């Protein structure tokens, strides 16, 4: 009975450690100049394809209506 209790305790401890490592590894952030997404955030600044302090608007040609 003692062996079974110890194995269950070790198993639960391993699961708890894996959950802790998952939180630590997935909560990282990226410095300026590195590619980012909403799921891979910047440490500071704004995500505009790469981590930047300010996003610049991309101004291009507007579509024209053709008849």
From Swiss-Prot:
Tissue localization of expression: Expressed by the venom duct.
GO molecular function: potassium channel regulator activity; toxin activity
Positions bearing Isoleucine amide: 59
S-S bridge residues: 29-43, 36-48, 42-51, 47-55
Source superkingdom: Eukaryota
Signal peptide region: 1-26
Main localisation: secreted
Keywords: Amidation, Cleavage on pair of basic residues, Disulfide bond, Ion channel impairing toxin, Neurotoxin, Potassium channel impairing toxin, Secreted, Signal, Toxin, Voltage-gated potassium channel impairing toxin
Pfam assignment, any one: Conotoxin_I2
Propeptide residues per the UniProt entry: 63-67
UniProt GO cellular component terms: extracellular region
Localization terms from the record: Secreted
Sequence similarity: Belongs to the conotoxin I2 superfamily.
Main function: Inhibits the vertebrate voltage-gated potassium channels Kv1.1/KCNA1 and Kv1.3/KCNA3.
Swiss-Prot/TrEMBL domain comment: The cysteine framework is XI (C-C-CC-CC-C-C).
Name this protein carries in UniProt: Kappa-conotoxin-like 1
Organism expressing this protein natively: Conus vexillum (Flag cone)
Taxonomic lineage: Eukaryota, Metazoa, Spiralia, Lophotrochozoa, Mollusca
């Amino acid at each position: 009975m003692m062996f079974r209790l110890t194995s269950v305790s070790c198993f639960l401890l391993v699961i708890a450690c894996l959950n802790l490592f998952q939180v630590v590894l997935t909560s990282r952030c990226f410095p300026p100049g590195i590619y980012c997404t909403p799921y891979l955030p910047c440490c500071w600044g704004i995500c505009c394809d790469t981590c930047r302090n300010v996003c610049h608007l991309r101004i291009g040609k507007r579509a024209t209506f053709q008849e």
